[in-house]
Design a protein with these regions (language model features):
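Hydrophobic-face positions in mid-chain alpha helices that act as interaction patches
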Residues: 126-127, 150-277
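Acidic interhelical loop/turn segments
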Residues: 19, 23-28, 99-130
Length: 280
């Protein structure tokens, strides 16, 4: 709650200052404004999901008091808005971001290989046009407006700039990196492995899998085919002498010493995917 609103305050400072400027003042004015508006909407949407009741709740008192939607950088206390009001504000802000970020149609290539230079290079590491559209699809879906969700998901799909990971890349496509195939937008983070190891693997409870987690995945199909995710996304960690099942999809092999590397040497960018094409 606190860190989210702290981040929102930084974004409000950026947006409030940009509103007194124009494209003639900054070369990438539209990208700056689009990213800031989009991120502000995303964080408010996450706060709504975490701290408010669902839009279909019958608790009208709780629905009337969801979260504050803060848009000013000042000491004024922002009153709470209703769940419906938050959805309206998030959607409106994401549509504004979409309009500002139209340049990404040209800036984002269909084939991403890494090593892009400059602010307009690695757009997959910024909140971008397709991030706005994918988030709109997710917001509309959660709101229950499936027709609108389909419209925005279709925009991302028809851009032909994102595809599902192949079965041969399942063990590496997002280990410590944003996927060059599936990621619509992500954040650069060179500490994914150490963060995951410290917060989810070494500490009992936080990253533990349920004893029946394998039942989610099909062991073998009628023709001998199997679910590749089970073999590629899970491993074992020795915690104080006791072997425990862990998820290695994000962090990589826990015994791989190269996982400790925090320097970028080309290829997929070190970081975390914020939304991928199957997550819209």
């Amino acid at each position: 709650w606190k860190t989210s609103y702290l981040a929102i305050s930084y974004l409000n400072n950026i947006i409030n200052n940009l509103e007194s400027k124009s494209e003639k003042d900054f070369r990438h004015y539209n990208l700056y404004m689009g990213e800031a508006l989009g991120l502000r909407a995303v964080i408010h949407f996450d706060l709504l999901r975490f701290f408010a009741v669902h839009v279909t709740s019958t608790d009208e008192v709780a629905k009337a008091r969801a979260i504050p939607y803060v848009t000013e950088y000042d000491f004024k206390v922002t009153p709470y808005s209703s769940v419906e009001e938050i959805y309206s504000k998030v959607i409106a802000e994401l549509k504004r971001a979409e309009a500002y970020l139209s340049e990404d149609e040209v800036l984002m290539p269909a084939e991403r290989v890494g090593n892009e230079n400059g602010f307009t290079g690695a757009r997959v590491l910024h909140f971008n046009l397709y991030g706005a559209q994918a988030t709109l699809a997710r917001v509309y879906w959660m709101k229950g407006d499936l027709d609108s969700a389909r419209i925005y998901a279709d925009k991302v799909i028809r851009s032909n700039k994102f595809r599902f990971a192949s079965k041969t890349s399942l063990n590496t496509f997002m280990q410590k990196t944003v996927s060059m195939e599936e990621t619509i937008w992500g954040l650069y983070n060179a500490e994914v492995y150490s963060d995951w190891l410290t917060q989810h693997v070494r500490r009992q409870g936080l990253g533990d899998l349920t004893t029946d987690f394998k039942s989610i995945y099909a062991y073998e199909g009628p023709t001998g085919k199997k679910d590749y995710r089970l073999d590629n996304w899970f491993g074992t960690y020795n915690r104080s002498g006791t072997p425990v099942d862990i998820l290695v999809k994000v962090m990589g092999n826990v015994s791989d010493t190269t996982s400790l590397t925090t320097s970028y040497n080309g290829g997929p960018y070190l970081g975390t995917s914020m939304i991928r094409i199957p997550e819209m």
